[in-house]
C-alpha cells in the first residue's frame, strides 16, 4: 500500500538469529485467551470478582486494540494489578527471528515458538503480508508443518509437528501489526489499517486445528480489539468435510476450498485428503455451508498445472460441478519450489481456462504471484526448521531469475 510522507515506516528487516539463542518463555501469555479466561486469570492474581469485568475490558483494549507489549504500558490498569499480572503472565508474541522482503513488497516473517516438550526445542512457522493498492492481506499459519501431503505444495513436504495454540495464531497478527506499525495509535494513510484482510492459507490445515483456529478468529474479529470483519477473513480448507459446517456456524468467516482438480482420481493424487472426502461429498458440504450466498460466495482455489488439470475439458467439468453453489474461482499459477514435480500452465492456457469459466457466469480471476523470490507465494511456505540444501537454494535462485 502506498504510504505518505511523515508516516511511520515499517520496521527494518531482521537478520536471522541462531536457533540456540532461543529462550522458552518462563510465564504463560495472556494472548489468545477469551474474556472468560482472562477473568479467571485476574481471579488467580487476587482481583475481586466485582472488578473482573471492568479489568477484562481494560486488558482487552490494551492487548488487542493498542497492542501493548508489556503490562507497564497499561496505564488505566491499577499498578497493583499490573504488578501482580507481570509476576505470573506475559503479553509476549511469537519471536520474530527473520524477515524477508520481496521485490514486490511482500514480507515474510519466520516466527519461533516453544515446542511444548521437555527438551524445549523451538519450532518455527511462517507468516506473510501481501500489500496491494486497496488492501493488505496477512496469510496466517495454523500448524507447524502439515499432515495433508498435497503433491504441489511445499509445506506438504514438511511433516506435521504440532497444532498452534489460539495465542500463537493471534500472535501472528500482532507480530505483523508490530512490524508494520499498524496499531490504532499509529498513523496510516487516510486512517485505514495496513492489514485489512486475513487469510488462513499459511502452513497447515485449519480445520484439523478447529478449536484453536475458531478461538483465534473470534478474537481477531472482535470489534473492541483487532477488529477485522469476518467478511474480510477467509478460512481455506483442503476439504475436512465434517468441520466445514461447524466453521460456518461457530466462526462465520468466508470459506475457501482448495479444489485443484475436477476428477476424483486426479484429486486423490494432488490432494490425498480426497480419498477420505471425495469431490461430491465436499461440494455438498459447500452447498450446505451456513450463510453462503451471492454476497458471501465460496472461493474455489485451483492451481494451474501444465498438462495436468488445465484443459478446457477440466474447465467445463468445473463449471458443471459448481452448479448451484454461489462461487468464485481463483486460478493460481503454480509457484515452483525446489524439488517440485510440476510446471506452471502456459499463460495462454490459463487465460483460455479463465475465459471459459467467466463466460459460464463465474468470477475467475488469475491470482498474481507475489513473493516468489522469497518463497512466500501460494504453496511455497515451509518452516526453516527444515533447512534448504545448497542445491535447493541454487534452484530457488535460478527460478527467481526466470520470473
Curated annotation (Swiss-Prot):
Q: At which positions is S-adenosyl-L-methionine bound?
A: 204-205, 236, 258-260, 335
User: Would you kindly state one Gene Ontology biological process term found in this protein's UniProt entry?
Assistant: rRNA base methylation
Q: Supply the enzyme class, top level.
A: transferase
Q: How is the cofactor bound?
A: Binds 1 [4Fe-4S] cluster. The cluster is coordinated with 3 cysteines and an exchangeable S-adenosyl-L-methionine.
Keywords per UniProt: 4Fe-4S, Cytoplasm, Disulfide bond, Iron, Iron-sulfur, Metal-binding, Methyltransferase, rRNA processing, S-adenosyl-L-methionine, Transferase, tRNA processing
> Which segments constitute the Radical SAM core domain?
132-375
State its role.
Answer: Specifically methylates position 2 of adenine 2503 in 23S rRNA and position 2 of adenine 37 in tRNAs. m2A2503 modification seems to play a crucial role in the proofreading step occurring at the peptidyl transferase center and thus would serve to optimize ribosomal fidelity.
Q: What is this protein called?
A: Dual-specificity RNA methyltransferase RlmN
Q: Which organism is it from?
A: Bradyrhizobium sp. (strain BTAi1 / ATCC BAA-1182)
Q: Taxonomic classification, please?
A: Bacteria, Pseudomonadati, Pseudomonadota, Alphaproteobacteria, Hyphomicrobiales
Amino acid at each position: 500500500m502506498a504510504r505518505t510522507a511523515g508516516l511511520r515506516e515499517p520496521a527494518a528487516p531482521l537478520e536471522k538469529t541462531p536457533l540456540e539463542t532461543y529462550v522458552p518463555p518462563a510465564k504463560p501469555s495472556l494472548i489468545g485467551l477469551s474474556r472468560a479466561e482472562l477473568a479467571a486469570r485476574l481471579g488467580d492474581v487476587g482481583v475481586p470478582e466485582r472488578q473482573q469485568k471492568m479489568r477484562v475490558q481494560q486488558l482487552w483494549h490494551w492487548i488487542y486494540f493498542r497492542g501493548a507489549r508489556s503490562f507497564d504500558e497499561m496505564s488505566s490498569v491499577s499498578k497493583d494489578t499490573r504488578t501482580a499480572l507481570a509476576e505470573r503472565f506475559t503479553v509476549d508474541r511469537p519471536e520474530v527471528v527473520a524477515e524477508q522482503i520481496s521485490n514486490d513488497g511482500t514480507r515474510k516473517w519466520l516466527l519461533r515458538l516453544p515446542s511444548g516438550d521437555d527438551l524445549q526445542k523451538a519450532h518455527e512457522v511462517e507468516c506473510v503480508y501481501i500489500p496491494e493498492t486497496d488492501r493488505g492481506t496477512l496469510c496466517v499459519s495454523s500448524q507447524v508443518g502439515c499432515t495433508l501431503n498435497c503433491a504441489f505444495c511445499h509445506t506438504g513436504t514438511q511433516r506435521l509437528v504440532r497444532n498452534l495454540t489460539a495465542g500463537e495464531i493471534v500472535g501472528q497478527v500482532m507480530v505483523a501489526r508490530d512490524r508494520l506499525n499498524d496499531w490504532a495509535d499509529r498513523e496510516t494513510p487516510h486512517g485505514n489499517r495496513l492489514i485489512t484482510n486475513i487469510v488462513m492459507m499459511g502452513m497447515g490445515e485449519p480445520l484439523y486445528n478447529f478449536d484453536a483456529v475458531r478461538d483465534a478468529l473470534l478474537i481477531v474479529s472482535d470489534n473492541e480489539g483487532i477488529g477485522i470483519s469476518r467478511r474480510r477473513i477467509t478460512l481455506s480448507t483442503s476439504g475436512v468435510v465434517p468441520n466445514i459446517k461447524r466453521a460456518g456456524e461457530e466462526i462465520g468467516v468466508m470459506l475457501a476450498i482448495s479444489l485443484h482438480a475436477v476428477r476424483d482420481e486426479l484429486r486423490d493424487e494432488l490432494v490425498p485428503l480426497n480419498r477420505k472426502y471425495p469431490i461430491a461429498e465436499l461440494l455438498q458440504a459447500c452447498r450446505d455451508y451456513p450463510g453462503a450466498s451471492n454476497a458471501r460466495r465460496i472461493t474455489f482455489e485451483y492451481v494451474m498445472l501444465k498438462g495436468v488439470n488445465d484443459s478446457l475439458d477440466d474447465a467445463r467439468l468445473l463449471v458443471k460441478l459448481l452448479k448451484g453453489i454461489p462461487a468464485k474461482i481463483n486460478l493460481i499459477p503454480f509457484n515452483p519450489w525446489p524439488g517440485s514435480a510440476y510446471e506452471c500452465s502456459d499463460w495462454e492456457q490459463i487465460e483460455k481456462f479463465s475465459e471459459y469459466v467467466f463466460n459460464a457466469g463465474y468470477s475467475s480471476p488469475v491470482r498474481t504471484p507475489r513473493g516468489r523470490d522469497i518463497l512466500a507465494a501460494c504453496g511455497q511456505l515451509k518452516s526453516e526448521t527444515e533447512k534448504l540444501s545448497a542445491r535447493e537454494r541454487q534452484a530457488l535462485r535460478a527460478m527467481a531469475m526466470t520470473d
